Design a protein with these regions (language model features):
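Conserved, structured core segments of small domains
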Residues: 1-137
Length: 137
């Protein structure tokens, strides 16, 4: 019996202006290609889910829990959506990212490994023992 370890990755789709200047027919093709890609990855057991995000939201920050508008949709760096992948390794996640139909139109796909919760616990334990100072390892 073979045991294969799988890893979790997020594909973060950046840029909300990729569709500017597309004709309705071009836009429909991209959306159809995108949905077919998503459904194929789900059928292969590689994508557990994902969603587009609304263009704008709120940002909560700081000790005072300040709420501000943003991030702003016009940014090429704004996160437009995500997929949650379970794949063999980072190389497979990157190969999947390269298949994104939006790349041809200016989208950016960021591939990020999902941290194991135990690494967060280990970091907290190091803080409590004084092994980490100033928030840096």
């Amino acid at each position: 019996m073979s045991t294969t370890t799988k890893s979790d990755y997020l594909l973060l789709f950046r840029g909300n202006v990729w569709d500017r200047g597309l004709s309705p027919a071009q836009l429909q093709k991209v959306v159809s290609d995108w949905m077919a890609w998503f459904e194929r990855l789900k059928a292969e057991g590689k994508c557990a889910g994902g969603h587009p995000l609304e263009d704008e939201g709120k940002v909560v920050s700081g000790k005072q829990r300040t709420v501000a508008d943003g991030p702003f949709a016009e940014s090429k760096e704004a996160i437009a959506g995500y997929f949650f992948l379970t794949v063999a390794d980072e190389n497979e996640a990157i190969e999947i990212a390269k298949q994104c139909p939006g790349l041809e139109y200016g989208s950016i796909v960021e591939v990020r490994p999902v941290a194991d919760i135990s690494s967060v616990r280990q970091r907290a334990e190091k803080y409590s023992r004084g092994e980490l100072a100033g928030g840096k390892a």
